[in-house]
UniProtKB/Swiss-Prot annotation:
Organism per entry: Marinobacter nauticus (strain ATCC 700491 / DSM 11845 / VT8) (Marinobacter aquaeolei)
Signal peptide per UniProt: none
InterPro entries: Ribosomal_bL28 (IPR026569), Ribosomal_bL28/bL31-like_sf (IPR034704), Ribosomal_bL28_bact-type (IPR001383), Ribosomal_bL28_sf (IPR037147)
Name the UniProt record assigns to this protein: Large ribosomal subunit protein bL28
Domain of life according to the entry: Bacteria
Record-level GO BP terms: translation
Length: 78
């Protein structure tokens, strides 16, 4: 399972750890992904999504039905 948010498409990015002595070592910044079950009232069932916390806020704002419609339009299976 890849570390990609199903709603926003956020994925890991790379950067550097920088010590006090300004030594740089490569690292990955991972998105804050959560496996979450959302109740879809129109379908009378739960839908499991792997979403970032930003994705959860988008679902709170737009509603789960609108977000699922966007996902299905992209061809993602939910």
């Amino acid at each position: 399972m890849s570390r990609v948010c199903q709603v926003t498409g956020k994925r890991p990015v790379t950067g550097n750890n920088v010590s006090h002595a300004m030594n740089h070592t490569r690292r990955r910044f991972l998105p804050n992904l959560q496996n979450h079950r959302f109740w879809v009232e129109s379908e009378k069932r739960f839908v499991k999504l792997r979403v970032s916390t930003k994705g959860m806020r988008i679902i709170d704002k737009k509603g789960i039905d609108a977000v699922l419609a966007d996902l299905r339009a992209r061809g993602e299976k939910v």
